[in-house]
């Protein structure tokens, strides 16, 4: 075993926990420094989901992806900051304070995997692991100017991921370039018997830049209302670059986009209200002295342990699942979700990948979006891929006012290789 010391100048607050001295072995990632999002279990290292309620929780086991990384020789150097339990788009909803965008400390890095993106963008680590429930890898990748992949649902084991919304979230890689991302992905993808949703589809692929004959779907909805015209123009130029390399752009539509955001928030909050019911604040988190009933004590522990946004989403989800509202909200959300899947299936009969902006705008200022509904709207372009379970990637494609813009590429089920090749081709074409 070899040793590595890690004392980063973390001026952007990318990390919650760092490991000063790391041991690592031989393998395809030998000595590669990797940061891990703090909702992914690491044996012997505090894992808090950036929440007070898990303060002091030290997992007795590693998540499957962490085991794979260690077996590949990676040096896991710390746990990164995030929006509490993955609920946010800015990494401002953390019990440990916000992470700053390395490119402009007055702006957010995106979320919820903002710490992972910031650590990579700031050059503190070679690559990072995040999780993506509705854009939580792709959003910070776009805002920080790095590459981030949400794999096809089931292609990476979720064993050891502290769940927020099981049917939506997926662990994925983040890196400064496509080749490094591909190397990391080749290690973490594959079957795991401990995750019932895991699929035996390992990733053993080296990116290629030949995209001759590739058909790129360009949905009208990705360039419509709510999208900054400057962002739209930068992304269209990126698609032009891909066309100059032999691809063909094909206009298309995703009519179900108008339902996607509502369906997503009903689904994810419903699943969160169930998943987070187990956190009682008794074993970990802040001590709340009370002589009241167990019911009151449980309520006070959770109020003290959970942040405002987490409490809001638990309440929303509980409401959606209530007997009198289940059909009105949750069942309708699942119908809309199927419509999104159907739209992707229809489009992918005629095209190979879908391209558009990752985010409607560039990274906004810290504290700028205090209205929750306004914040939720920024997920409009990323949630459809999670609802459908298809792979999606963000790659930097230009800048506006010195801040990066992300090109989002979405692929067919289990055709992660194709969107990675497309991103690699674009990266090489711009170089």
From Swiss-Prot:
From the UniProt record, give one GO term of the biological process aspect: translation
> Which parts pass through the membrane?
none
The alphabetical list of record keywords is:
ATP-binding, Ligase, Nucleotide-binding, Protein biosynthesis
| Top-level taxon of origin | Archaea
Q: Which Pfam families match?
A: Amidase
Name the enzyme's class.
ligase
Q: Name one GO cellular component term.
A: glutamyl-tRNA(Gln) amidotransferase complex
Stated EC number for the protein is 6.3.5.7
**What reaction does this enzyme carry out catalytically?**
L-glutamyl-tRNA(Gln) + L-glutamine + ATP + H2O = L-glutaminyl-tRNA(Gln) + L-glutamate + ADP + phosphate + H(+)
Molecular function terms from GO = ATP binding; glutaminyl-tRNA synthase (glutamine-hydrolyzing) activity
Catalytic positions? 37 (charge relay system), 112 (charge relay system), 136 (acyl-ester intermediate)
Give the matching PANTHER family: GLUTAMYL-TRNA(GLN) AMIDOTRANSFERASE SUBUNIT A, TRANSAMIDASE
| Quaternary structure, from the entry | Heterotrimer of A, B and C subunits.
Similarity section? Belongs to the amidase family. GatA subfamily.
What function does this protein fulfil?
Answer: Allows the formation of correctly charged Gln-tRNA(Gln) through the transamidation of misacylated Glu-tRNA(Gln) in organisms which lack glutaminyl-tRNA synthetase. The reaction takes place in the presence of glutamine and ATP through an activated gamma-phospho-Glu-tRNA(Gln).
The identity of this protein, by name, is Glutamyl-tRNA(Gln) amidotransferase subunit A
Organism in which the protein naturally occurs = Methanospirillum hungatei JF-1 (strain ATCC 27890 / DSM 864 / NBRC 100397 / JF-1)
Gene that codes for this?
A: gatA
